[in-house]
Amino acid sequence: MGTAEARKYIQELRRKQENPYLWPDFLTGLPDKPAILKKLGEAFPKLGKYSIAYVRIANIHPYLIKYGPDRHADIIQWAAAILKTTCEKCRNCFVGTVSTHDFIIMCESKDMGGHIREAGRIFKKRIEAYYSKEDLQKKTALSFIRNGERINVGLMRLITVIADNKVHTEKSRLIHDMGRVCEALETTDDDIVVMNNAMICKGR
């Protein structure tokens, strides 16, 4: 590579660095934290018209304990692809990855519920390929006794916390707070919850 080519490479690199939307996560191809923060700055003042969703692949750790890590990347990529292609059906829908198993969606409030439900249905169908027939029939990945009580851990699913109205938190804390609510949601049978101020206060 000569000087001219090297200079062109650096110019292209710097152009991309000026726009965080061009910094995709290697595993998923989705925009990562810099792009999420930039988009959050646009969406947060418009909560109500726009919604922000925090989506997690629930019960993936029990799956990895039982079945091993061989298909770990494949599961993450399928979740990302399902969320991305589902949300592409409407204008101005943003999908990014905030951590290994967690994603952020931002779009108009009128579209969010439909996106989330459709993505959940598609993912539920897709994960059938990762479990044994026995686990699918029982809808349980792991089962064990804790303090004399039988604990059954279900199959992987997408769970979502949605912020669609102003909540009593700063923009800089919103994603952190949504992630914390998502952790609590994972211990329930619910797939979707709309975030409120009581949920934020409970965890602080």
Roles of regions detected by a PLM:
Residues 1-17, 179-180, 196-204:
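Regulatory sensory/coupling modules that transmit signals to nucleotide-handling catalytic cores
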Residues 23-24, 29-41, 47-51, 58-84, ...:
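Conserved long alpha-helical elements within nucleotide-processing catalytic cores of c-di-GMP signaling
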Residues 51-53, 95-96, 104, 161, ...:
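Conserved beta-strand cores of small sensory beta-sandwich domains that regulate signal transduction
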Residues 57, 105-110, 164-165:
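Short beta-strand-to-loop capping motifs
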Residues 128, 158-159, 164-202:
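Catalytic/regulatory signature loops of cyclic-dinucleotide turnover enzymes
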Residues 146-162:
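Alpha-helix-centered segments that form part of catalytic cores
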